[in-house]
């Protein structure tokens, strides 16, 4: 059973001053703990990151081994049917790795519910900065750090910056900051939200979240 929760945020400008309007976010969350959905989405995410392409050859796939090495009886040696037996050097591998598909299907509504649950749990650590994407004109780390200082954002902690468009200016301005992860709103995922201590959203990004994840 889901219930609706409303969160209201007052956005800041690039100088850290509050603007005279609000953004409201309507979230659907479970009455009971939604941690199991977050866990399922994490398993799905980790599975999609794996290649799982390692492969070894069995005795039937190794080249050679068609001829019986020696006759069955009379030699005093142990019987052998192929020199590509797993017991022999150069033989096949028993129960070796094979390419496999690792995936967990998760319904769209389940994934949306997991993301909304995490956003609600992190509601006190979310900050909205107006026009961050268009306001930064120079690709300088110093300029981005000053904006964070004015908005009282601690760059010693993990910061998730969610934008609609990963512009070259923002990429260059944040790439030298080890604790800042720049993420497009269309790629929002549970792992990035979980790792972040602070989440910065632009106004365009929060509108994208409303349309894509909170319908």
Swiss-Prot record:
Residues 48-57 have a biased composition (Polar residues). It is found in: Plastid, Chloroplast. SUPFAM superfamilies: Ribosomal protein L4. GO terms for cellular component: chloroplast; ribonucleoprotein complex; ribosome. Residues 48-85 are annotated as: Disordered. Keywords: Chloroplast, Plastid, Ribonucleoprotein, Ribosomal protein, RNA-binding, rRNA-binding. It comes from the Eukaryota. GO terms for biological process: translation. Residues 65-76 have a biased composition (Basic residues). GO terms for molecular function: rRNA binding; structural constituent of ribosome. Part of the 50S ribosomal subunit. Probably binds the 23S rRNA. Belongs to the universal ribosomal protein uL4 family. This is Large ribosomal subunit protein uL4c. It comes from Phaeodactylum tricornutum (strain CCAP 1055/1).
């Amino acid at each position: 059973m889901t219930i609706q929760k409303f969160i209201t945020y007052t956005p800041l400008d690039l100088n850290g001053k509050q603007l005279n309007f609000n953004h409201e976010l309507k979230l659907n969350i479970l009455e009971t703990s939604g941690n199991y959905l977050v866990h399922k989405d994490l398993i799905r995410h980790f599975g999609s990151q794996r290649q799982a392409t390692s492969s070894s050859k069995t005795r039937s796939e190794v080249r050679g081994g068609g001829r019986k090495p020696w006759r069955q009886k009379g030699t005093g040696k142990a019987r052998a049917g192929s020199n590509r037996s797993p017991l022999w050097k150069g033989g096949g591998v028993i129960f070796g790795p094979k390419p496999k598909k690792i995936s967990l299907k998760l319904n769209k509504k389940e994934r949306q519910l997991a993301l909304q649950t995490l956003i609600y749990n992190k509601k006190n650590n979310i900050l909205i900065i107006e026009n961050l994407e268009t306001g930064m004109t120079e690709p300088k780390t110093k300029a981005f750090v000053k904006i964070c200082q004015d908005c009282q954002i601690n760059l010693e902690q993990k910061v998730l910056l969610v934008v609609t468009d990963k512009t070259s200016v923002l990429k260059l301005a944040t790439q030298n900051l080890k604790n800042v992860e720049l993420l497009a709103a269309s790629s929002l995922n549970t792992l990035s939200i979980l790792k972040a201590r602070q989440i910065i959203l632009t106004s365009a990004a929060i509108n994208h979240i409303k349309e894509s994840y909170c319908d």
